[in-house]
Amino acid sequence: MRIMGLDVGDKTIGIAISDLSGTIAQGLTTIKRSSNKKDFERIKQIINEYEVGMIIVGLPKNLNGTLGPQGQKVVRFVEHLKEAINIPIILWDERLTTVEAERVLIEKADISRAKRKEVIDKLAAVLILQNYLDSQKNK
C-alpha cells in the first residue's frame, strides 16, 4: 500500500508518495491551490492513480506544541478532505519541516531562491511522510 504525504499551505499543497513497501518517500508534485473542490479532485486523481491507502498531512504546530492559525487551517482542510475521500487521514506534527526543507535546498542542492520556491512544499511533504514512515519502522 502506498501512503501519500501532504504539506498544505495557503497557496500550494506539496505532495509526496511512498514506495509500495512504505519505506521511502519521494516528491511527486505541487498543486497550486484554487478551491477545496478542485484541490480534492486532484488529490483523488492521485489516490486512484497510485492506489494510495492512507494520507499523512503535516500539522504545523508552534514550538510549544500548540496550534496556531495555520495549524487550525490545516485541521479544517482535513475535516473537509475526510468528507470527500474514504481512506484514513493522519495529522502528523510537522514542526520545522519547511525550515529543514529550505536548509537542505540551500546547503545541499545550492538551488536559487526562485527555484527553491517551486520545490520547497514538495520537499516538505517528503520530509513529513519520511518522518512518519521512519516512526512506523521503529514500532
From Swiss-Prot:
Enzyme class: hydrolase
UniProt keyword annotations, A-Z: Cytoplasm, Hydrolase, Nuclease, Ribosome biogenesis
Principal subcellular localisation of the protein: cytoplasm
SUPFAM superfamilies noted in UniProt: Ribonuclease H-like
Pfam families: RuvX
Biological process terms in GO annotation: rRNA 5'-end processing
Alphabetical list of CDD domains matching this protein: YqgF (cd16964)
Molecular-function GO terms, alphabetical: nuclease activity
Cellular component per GO, a single term: cytosol
Location in the cell: Cytoplasm
EC number, as in UniProt: 3.1.-.-
Annotated InterPro entries: RNaseH-like_sf, YqgF, YqgF/RNaseH-like_dom, YqgF/RNaseH-like_dom_sf
Family: Belongs to the YqgF nuclease family.
Function in brief: Could be a nuclease involved in processing of the 5'-end of pre-16S rRNA.
Protein name (record): Putative pre-16S rRNA nuclease
Taxonomic source organism: Thermoanaerobacter sp. (strain X514)
Upper lineage: Bacteria, Bacillati, Bacillota, Clostridia, Thermoanaerobacterales
